[in-house]
Amino acid sequence: MQYRRRVLDDQLDELMTGVAALEIVGPRAVGKTETASARARTVFRLDDPGTRAIIEGDPERLVRSPRPVLIDEWQRMPSSWDLVRRAVDAERSPGQFLLTGSASPASPPTHTGAGRIVSLRMRPMTLMERGIASPSVSLAALLRGEAERVAGTTGVGLDEYARQMLASGLPGLLGLSDRSARAELDGYLSRVIDRDLADAALPVRNAPALRRWMEAYAAAISTTTSLAKIREAAGGGRSDQPTRPTAAREGG
């Protein structure tokens, strides 16, 4: 399958010629592993129990393998972060390591990696990345003062724009029917609640209540609302709705 270039690739093109180690962060299935794998000579997938067992027995394999080295789901073995940091301290040549992860480790590394590991965020696919539209206004050019006026057109109508929003920007869902995409997204959300949070040492005591909270929070995106209204929508008059301190904490 031909690799579909992402917006982040422009940053990677530049930074991998000057930075020794890069971390790509973002939600599960957003395309981090595929993008990083396209640039790596060696790939270690630490979500694979067999690979993780080998690396736990010989951690230095991560930093002595042919580079660039991709350490995928590095948070499954938090010590890998410090191994990379020390390797960068020993050799500062650019483009040595790529780290990808979908969650924060239960036991954080002993060092933040500041000055050694640069973090980049990968976001869901834009309409341009999906091949739906071509950009006609550059935000970067506007911020640099290079554009005298803002003018642009698009052939994407409101109905198609709404459909693309509902389809999400996850690359694995491109081309699926609306029903299949909805099923995939429903399963995605269930996995986050039932497994991913627990893997990140964030056990969920009331999965149905958390799901209602997430639905209410999502419905309020890009609106002017209050935490109290989101909390009420999540509770729906039920007795198990989150308390105000819990809602404030979970809502960020």
Question: Predicted segments — roles?
Answer:
Residues 54-98:
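Conserved nucleotide-sensing/catalytic segment adjacent to the nucleotide-binding pocket
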Residues 1-13:
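N-terminal pre-Walker A segment at the start of P-loop NTPase domains
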Residues 27:
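P-loop (Walker A) phosphate-binding loop of NTP-binding proteins
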